[in-house]
């Protein structure tokens, strides 16, 4: 095993007994190396090529192993924050996704709305696990689009805690791991009601409804004034009505997912009382300076933020959607066929954990060095994809496995390099 990858996995040894850690390390390495469907039985063939351990040990490790996923999330969060955000505010993204499953009895699976396939006119439901994921937003050294590295997760169950309660739970857990840090949390408009109930030190950015009922801040009480203090001021026009204003707009330069843009912005401090309670918000209406896009209506609870920061923060939220796609498509997060006990939830969680570890390893070992092969039809490629990072790690692990004695390789270097290249890109 690569020394750097081995050191990364060793960071989690304290969460397991020695036998369980060996299964954990071999399982994650096999997950990286396995081409095609990531079923547990297929991973077992790579993890135990000589059959030294029964395959049921891997099923039992996920289904009923005496270890806690929360301990792994804590160790992962400490690892990621120390590497990418050692100081300053910690940027987080929050969203939920559906892992499709099939089978008559998959623990905690149910029918959920499939946000990817649903439209405004047609709602599509699918069977699977509904997962709430909290990720760390990372700006890679090569620039461009940010990355969203998962550092906590909860399984949303039918009849269980609502998504809002689970969201407050995962955020509170991360706060307990970093008690002296402040956080910038970003989520889509569905999670806007969180703004009024987040702990101190968490600043929230989300989308604002176009027809939101906004109010002025309550007026200051006069000396000797009787009666209850007012909770809100006078009713304001809706954001859509405010956007019709001809004055008050100003032009700003923003950076959205690594690209420079020109925007016209209109801002105002207000109360979205029926959603955020008495927490004041900064409303930001963002307009495309060229008039090609619809207006965006955003808000943040950080009243000191600039419009440019609010727009860039919300635009960067798309990184977590990239994470969901990559985990499903390249890590086969939906593939493990484990149906009972904690198996389905743990397998899904490990796929997100592995995604974060692959990117951390790649940034630490490769940095800005080009590790991918330029293709004739894509000569201008300047930044790595997750598949490039995964292929780089596969190449290192396959080379170590096939040619452990590098001083006297059994194949000619040209043949060995070609073999490793093919294996590393087999998906």
What are these regions (language model features)?
Residues 30, 63-145, 151-153, 255-256, ...:
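Active-site-proximal, Lys/Arg-enriched surface segment
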Residues 16-20, 31, 35-104, 110-111, ...:
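Electropositive nucleic-acid engagement tracts
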Residues 28-31, 61, 183-190:
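Conserved short loop/turn motifs at secondary-structure junctions
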Residues 10, 22-28, 41:
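Double-stranded DNA-binding cores of transcription factors and transposases
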Residues 39-52, 135-144, 275:
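Glycine/proline-rich, flexible active-site/cofactor-binding loop segments
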Residues 26-31, 351-355:
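Contiguous, well-ordered alpha-helical segments that form the cores/surfaces of helical PPI scaffolds
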Residues 1-12, 20, 47, 88, ...:
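Single, function-defining residue in the core of a domain
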């Amino acid at each position: 095993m690569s020394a750097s990858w081995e050191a990364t996995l060793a960071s989690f040894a304290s969460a397991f007994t020695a036998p369980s850690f060996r299964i954990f390390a071999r399982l994650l390495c096999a997950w990286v190396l396995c081409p095609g469907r990531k079923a547990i039985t297929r991973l077992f063939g790579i993890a135990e090529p000589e059959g030294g351990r029964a395959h049921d040990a891997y099923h039992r490790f996920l289904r009923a192993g005496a270890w806690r996923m929360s301990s792994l999330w804590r160790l992962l969060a400490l690892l990621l924050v120390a590497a990418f955000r050692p100081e300053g505010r910690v940027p987080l993204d929050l969203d939920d996704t559906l892992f499709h499953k099939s089978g008559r009895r998959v623990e905690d699976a149910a029918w959920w709305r499939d946000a990817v396939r649903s439209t405004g006119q047609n709602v599509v439901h699918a069977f699977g696990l509904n997962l709430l994921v909290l990720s760390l937003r990372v700006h890679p050294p090569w620039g461009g689009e940010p990355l969203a590295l998962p550092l906590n997760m909860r399984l949303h169950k039918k009849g269980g805690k609502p998504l809002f309660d689970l969201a407050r739970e995962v955020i509170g857990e991360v706060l307990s791991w970093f008690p002296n840090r402040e956080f910038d949390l970003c989520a889509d408009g569905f999670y806007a009601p969180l703004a009024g109930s987040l702990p101190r030190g968490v600043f929230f950015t989300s989308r604002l409804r176009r027809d939101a009922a906004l109010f002025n801040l309550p007026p200051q009480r006069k000396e000797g004034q009787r009666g209850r203090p007012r909770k809100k001021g006078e009713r304001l026009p809706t954001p859509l009505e405010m956007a019709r204003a001809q004055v008050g707009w100003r032009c700003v330069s923003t950076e959205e997912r690594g690209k420079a843009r020109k925007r016209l912005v209109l801002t105002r401090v207000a109360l979205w009382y029926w959603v955020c309670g008495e927490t004041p918000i900064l409303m930001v209406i963002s307009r495309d300076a060229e008039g090609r896009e619809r207006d965006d209506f955003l808000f943040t609870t950080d009243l000191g933020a600039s419009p440019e920061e609010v727009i860039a923060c919300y635009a960067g939220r798309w990184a977590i959607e990239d994470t969901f796609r990559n985990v499903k498509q390249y890590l086969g997060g939906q593939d493990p066929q484990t149906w009972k006990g904690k198996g389905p939830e743990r397998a899904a969680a490990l796929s997100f954990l592995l995604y974060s570890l692959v990117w951390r390893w790649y940034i630490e070992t490769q940095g800005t060095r080009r590790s991918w092969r330029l293709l004739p039809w894509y000569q201008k490629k300047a930044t790595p994809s997750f598949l490039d990072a995964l292929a780089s790690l596969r190449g290192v692990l396959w080379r170590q496995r096939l040619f452990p004695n590098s001083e006297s390789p059994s194949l000619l270097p040209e043949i060995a390099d070609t073999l490793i290249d093919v294996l590393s890109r087999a998906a």
